[in-house]
């Protein structure tokens, strides 16, 4: 199974949807705890499913099981928790949750442009360890 990850920051709507379509993404899995963000208006929870379906024929789901807890996110963003410690604690949170079943061609969505500093890379690696999954960062 191929699992993509994508961050929408620093992308125009055209770039974002073209990348998804050009790579054959079938489902966007939104793993943001708060998906009403205004960093890019086209990614708001109330609009994104419609845009994905209408522009590219791509499905949408919101999976909080793959989002960090509020406390962990605050420790990372506001209190300076190093990313490696954040990743370790996030994996421990994942161990306590039921992971969603993803389809081939799913793309984990978050805001960060760089997967190396985003929880989507931790989530993708975690899921890859649980099965036959190839991770591709878009």
Predicted features by range, described:
Residues 1-138:
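Residues lining hydrophobic/aromatic ligand-binding pockets adjacent to catalytic sites
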